């Protein structure tokens, strides 16, 4: 299982790629926030970055499944 660590807008994230076109996105910090995203096979990393920038992780429920299309 591949993991990608990156910083975006001074926040730290880990993307953990799972089977069945799913990725777990973890926003690290004082308390980790985790969401699971279903994506299509043609989804690009830049698509993830745009979505992550627009999400307010403090308002997302942990382990909620979202779909990128």
Features from the language model and the residues they span:
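Polybasic (Lys/Arg-rich)
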Residues: 1-69
């Amino acid at each position: 299982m591949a993991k990608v660590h990156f910083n975006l807008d001074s926040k730290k994230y880990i993307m953990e790629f799972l089977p069945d076109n799913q990725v777990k996105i973890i926003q690290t910090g004082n308390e980790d926030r985790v969401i699971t995203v279903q994506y299509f096979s043609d989804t690009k990393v830049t698509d993830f970055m745009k979505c992550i920038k627009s999400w307010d992780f403090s308002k997302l429920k942990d382990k909620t499944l979202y779909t990128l299309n």
